């Protein structure tokens, strides 16, 4: 007898007639007049539960099996048999069942068999992974995460753990969470009446990071190819389906690389990750196609078989101005493209993923390399049909004099970036990288539109439960 996951039984890894033990939670129980109960038991290893056929000859049939309800946990031992029922290849002829945990009051169990709205499930984030939709999201999220790590490992990248607590603002945006151990009821003050951060834990102002990019650049300038994969934080007071206060980012940095190199890397990474999901998680994708977004499988298959289009920002603006479409936000050179503009380009004009390159410098960050025209920077966005921007990246400014000029233009203090400037003083090198918002990727793959539903415990304005 061996411990078996439900997935391993369905994959045929246990011979018919072999005895296995499956451990999981009851989804449903159905009793027949012939004295047999049918238990649907799931363990999270795959989408479908396994059916356990439980005879009334078991000693605990009357006093335990017939009292099982949704959510009870069980340890079920039996023989693997081919299933006569539709939709599953194998089931378990149960010879022993142990109840590991009961549901106190089945009538008030929040995850009973009835269907809940996804909005309601957000209020029950500790229980929602027991539902079909959130369980499927979790498996797809894991698959994408593992695929991204595999991709970079196979490409010779080194994973770098960048700090979550920082004193620098990568984006120059100012929307950062402050980290402090000062007594909020009795803040120390300077002679000028300002908060005296010299008395704080780090002896200066500190924040939760908005990006690991600047730190990753320092390692790329020594190890050639690196990436980060971890949480980032934005104190942006936005209550929308596209914003989180805490989310995960994938950020590769490559030395001796230009914008075209990094665009090719982005395309290869996305296709690798999507192929992994199509190969490994078709059971979950089928559920999403049936119940969430019928286009998810076709969209991923189309994505991996498409060549990415490329267009300069200036040409993209001209396309949008001449397309005959009236947009909610009018298009002119110098604006940051909105979601409606991005989706038109990807879905209607190019009908494929598209890389928009060379944006106006005034709408981009200080670290992006200034182009020879003096007006644009070597920045890119990858736009995907169905969602718009999914990746943003750039060639980094490796020239110290130009970097200093950009810092001054954006009223950023050179002294705060002394270590970042050092990289341009000691063996500077052209380099490039991008950032991928991981939750946006999971949302795109699953069709689950609100990114609060693709991260286990969402953090948003006035939302920090659990």
UniProtKB/Swiss-Prot annotation:
Protein location: Cytoplasm
EC number(s) stated in the UniProt entry for this protein: 6.1.1.22
GO molecular function: asparagine-tRNA ligase activity; ATP binding; nucleic acid binding
GO-annotated cellular components: cytoplasm
Keywords tagged on the record: Aminoacyl-tRNA synthetase, ATP-binding, Cytoplasm, Ligase, Nucleotide-binding, Protein biosynthesis
Tagged with keyword Amino-acid biosynthesis: no
Enzyme class, broadest EC rank: ligase
Ranges in a coiled coil: none
The organism's place on the tree of life at top rank: Bacteria
GO biological process: asparaginyl-tRNA aminoacylation
Catalytic activity: tRNA(Asn) + L-asparagine + ATP = L-asparaginyl-tRNA(Asn) + AMP + diphosphate + H(+)
UniProt cross-references to PROSITE patterns, sorted A to Z: AA_TRNA_LIGASE_II
Self-association and partners: Homodimer.
Family: Belongs to the class-II aminoacyl-tRNA synthetase family.
HAMAP family recorded: Asn_tRNA_synth
The protein's name: Asparagine--tRNA ligase
Record gene name: asnS
